[in-house]
């Protein structure tokens, strides 16, 4: 009984546990760093005017120019989607404590754009600003085909789990057997990278650094063990 207790303590301290006699459970993690090949940005036009119709008209005109510019830059129509249309009253408040009154109207037209050639991103940002874009609500870098990188991370996670199992089995003086169960945990996809507000300028090309994305995977494996 003393030997069995020592085995359980050893394995527990190492991050694994014997689920039942003849079985050992381990977890493995894998990560792959990859350069993103796509950017997803949300941009828009906002305009304020005394008349609601004027606000909508001006915003629509600028949005139309931006859509035409994106088309001219080679952005496919399937990669451009209107994500928000809004019209709100702008209230003016008085120091006397009187109720606020409508002073103007603000119209906003926002689109989400996928840029499949990251090298064009700086040019796209600069050109749409020139055409009237005055709102940038986010920039995320992504992968067009993440599956192969996810599979690489999974293979690394499985290898990590097996290496742990072999180590624990050797340390405990038992023989590692076949895989009895394997399950995938919550992997972590590429994290979005925020765009700095300072990038909103009408230069020839806005400098943007894509960096790297990390694709992660996690597995839990159950092995048989024998004396």
Locate each region found by the language model.
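Short, charge-dense linear interaction motifs
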Residues: 2-5, 14-227
């Amino acid at each position: 009984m003393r030997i069995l207790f020592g085995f359980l303590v050893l394995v527990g301290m190492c991050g694994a546990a014997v689920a039942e006699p003849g079985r050992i459970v381990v977890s493995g993690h894998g990560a792959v760093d990859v350069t993103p090949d796509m950017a997803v940005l949300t941009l828009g036009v906002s305009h304020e005017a005394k008349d609601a119709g004027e606000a909508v008209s001006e915003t629509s005109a600028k949005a139309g120019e931006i859509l035409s510019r994106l088309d001219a830059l080679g952005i496919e129509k399937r990669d451009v989607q209107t994500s928000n249309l809004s019209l709100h009253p702008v209230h003016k408040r008085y120091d006397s404590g009187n109720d606020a009154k409508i002073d103007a109207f603000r119209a906003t037209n926002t689109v989400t754009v996928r840029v499949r050639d990251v090298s064009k991103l700086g040019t796209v940002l600069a050109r749409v600003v020139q055409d009237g874009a005055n709102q940038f609500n986010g920039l995320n870098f992504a992968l067009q085909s993440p599956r192969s990188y996810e599979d690489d991370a999974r293979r690394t996670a499985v290898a990590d789990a097996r290496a742990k199992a072999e180590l624990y089995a050797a340390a405990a003086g038992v023989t590692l057997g076949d895989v009895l169960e394997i399950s995938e945990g919550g992997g972590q996809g590429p994290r979005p990278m925020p765009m700095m507000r300072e990038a909103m300028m009408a230069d020839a090309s806005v400098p943007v650094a894509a960096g790297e994305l990390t694709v992660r995977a996690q597995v839990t494996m159950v092995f048989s063990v024998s004396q």
